[in-house]
Amino acid sequence: MLAVSGLVTGAMVWGLIWYPYRVLQQAGVGGEFATLVTYAVALGIGLVAFGRELRVAPRSWMLGWIAITAGWTNLAYVLAVIEGEVMRVMLLFYLAPLWTVLFARALLGERVGKVGALVVLLSLAGAATMLYEPAGGLPLPANRAEWMGLSAGLMFALSNVLARKAHEHSVAMKSVAIWFGVTVVCLIYGAGQADFLPGAQALAPAVLGLMALVGVVLFALSLIVQYGLAHTAANQAIVIMLLELVFAAIAAYYLAGEAMHAREWAGGAMIVAASLFSGKLTEHPPG
């Protein structure tokens, strides 16, 4: 029951996490800087909490790749939900099972099989339906935010496959690698942005407090979700985590006035179905 509660909590928070980042942007703090600070807070807490374990834990290049891929995943996701329509971005992110099937085949040697093929077909059909434009042209993401959401899902899938490959590392070690990776990727990406650093007037106590709070939430959320995944069957976990889309749809409607059209609902349903079938690809959740 505790594991299920953890996953439901994780789904709810991930479905709402876009909102404080939008609030921060409206206060004058861009997505790159806000992501940097919030994940730096999570990293700082993690280094203190797991310092003793980290000092004796084995190192490997795989942790570096996990850091890089997870770093882009989280930065791209934040930028996407700030700039774009929340549900369209999240559904493009939820094409991750499609990429997971392909990466697992390439990196882990897993057979695609009938279920894997069904996941691929449903994902592609859902994306094509949602992105179709009557005016013509290829069904591709319409703007930078949607491309960011798509790339975040792709990197999320790759980081998960890499995490499965790095099974000798603890949850704490992989979590710290993720927080470190996000911090570094934000610094590199932000270095090329003229407006990366907000003005001093934007960094009011309330703004700093909100960023610190989000950082604490990200730290706790990572551990809660990892615990839930470790103690819940894959089929059940994927269904619970899909509640994120429900929470996000409700929040986007009431907090941002965003609503999906019939074609987007149809495409989204196929993407959700692909995610549900993806839970049958493995008996044990990654991580």
Which residues are covered by each model-predicted region?
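Specific alpha-helical transmembrane segments that line the substrate/conduction pathway
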Residues: 33-36, 40, 78-108, 234-253
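Specific transmembrane alpha-helical segments of multi-pass solute transporters/efflux pumps
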Residues: 13-16, 53-88, 129, 216-232
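C-terminal transmembrane-helix exit sites in multi-pass transporters
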Residues: 50, 96-121, 246-265
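Transmembrane alpha-helical segments that form core, pore/gating elements
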Residues: 7, 11-23, 46, 100-101, ...
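Helix-helix packing/entry segments at the starts of transmembrane helices
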Residues: 90-95, 163-182, 218-254
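C-terminal-most transmembrane helix of multi-pass membrane proteins
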Residues: 132, 238, 242-287
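Hydrophobic alpha-helical transmembrane segments of multi-pass integral membrane proteins
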Residues: 1-6, 31-48, 119-122, 147, ...
